Amino acid sequence: MLDQVNLNQPDIDKGTYKETHDALIERLVTLQQQARLQSVGLVVLFEGWNGAGKGSRISDLMFNLDARATSVHVTGDFDVDEARAFSDAGHNVTGYWPFMQQFWQALGPRGAITFYDRGWYSVAAERAMCRAFGGLNPKRKEGKKDTVRGDQLAARKEAGVCLASIREFERGLVDDGYEVVKFFIHVSAEGQRERLERLAADPTTAWRVDKKRLERIGNYEYAYSIYDLMLEGSNFAFAPWTLVNGEDKRRANIVIAQTLVRALESALARKEAANSASAASAASSVEPVSPEVPVNSADGAAKQPPRFAAPATSRFHLIDDAPTLAGVDHSLSLSPEEYKDELKSLQKRLFRLESNMYQARIPLMVMYEGWDAAGKGGNIKRVAQSLDARAYTIFPSPAPTAPELAHPHLWRYWTRLPKAGHVGIYDRSWYGRVLVERVEGYASPERLTQAYDEINAFEKDLVDWGAILLKFWVEVSPDEQLRRFEERQSNPAKQWKITDDDWRNREKYPQYKEAIEDMFRLTSTSFAPWIILESDDKRYARVKALRTIVAALEDAGLSD
């Protein structure tokens, strides 16, 4: 793709530039405010050569835009030493955090513009080079200037994993109401050398160009081939590349401004069309209400949302024997004596394994979903009791806050991950989208349809990072749940555990059961299957959870 960029275009004169650029910026400023009001998010990625002027192009835009609705994320240098250390450890963990975590963390809300100065493509290319060559400076074969040594197969594999993650990230943003604009600032080898040497010679800017960057100038041809392949493989219809001639900053500024104006105009037009369609649909679905029939039932529950038809399949590899609620054996139990002995033994083993896990820098994520009063909290306590308090975090999932609602659903979980070597325990999770939000009608049918594979993509990223991911469904029969509800209601010490919402959810058992079965079917992947904890006997469920965690750590090569 880079050969499409004409680097020999004549420079634009100052007068023509000012007139054209000023008009574009005026339009862009207006569109930014409209996007802010309509909650249209804009993600703007600047990739390109070192010294191509990415930072300057962003600065020129930031000078004119509303700073209250813009942010800039500067992607730091790839840490080769960290990558080598994790690779040498031999546990398939790629770093302290997943590849895409920093970019999710920096994502602004809908209605804002988020600029990325370098981003996921730079990191993907650097990871691939590091995997192939053990660093960012390819070693050339002696006597062959155009040939480099390295593990090309490993590089292609790493690049493939990264590009798959990138595609899901960009697709998810677009599906969630963001516009994604990607610029690659291209300059010639001579132009790059001249700029970097000029920066290095100026005491004011010399700090921006270290020795390693200057050394990489000699890798231009090899880096060109990597960039070109990367651009070809990621020129998605929903997030295409705009190639920019970086040799002329005036021409570059005009192309960038034109592209952003077109992107926001297109996004706002789609938003208006979607709002009109939604309003028309709502108007056509309104039914006359009889004076004798209240809109809400006596207990205050709202009218049920229409039945949702889940997708038939997934883009991801699903296991053939996904669990079902019908297959649960509710009679499984342990005697108090068996429970006491096994609990003590397993907790000791987990404590020792967790210490080894920390030293090996393996992240562990244990996620709990289940019926109200199924015993999630008590199960979590017995797991946490086995761990060093400094090594784990329990992440609850209450109703989302206003900032969380202004971001994609998974943003609140991408920003709540355990560091490599630590444990994250999730008391309810990202599956709320396909459970409570589905049953209560909080999410649109379109977003629900997309949610299953968005979750699968998220979990694939976690597993590719090297995390041990365990997904527990804590199951209890309706009869046992009713007994526990009544016990809580009659016991002053436990009354805080039972709410009106619990009773309302119980009344919606058929809707939740259908949602759960669809969840099992569409998110029981080969890399992150569901595990049912039969919890009519809480003792049995607690021991099974501990057994499962211990086995997973041992399967990862750890020993106690």
Task: Give short role names for the model-derived ranges.
Residues 1-560:
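Glycine-rich phosphate-binding loop of ATP-dependent small-molecule kinases
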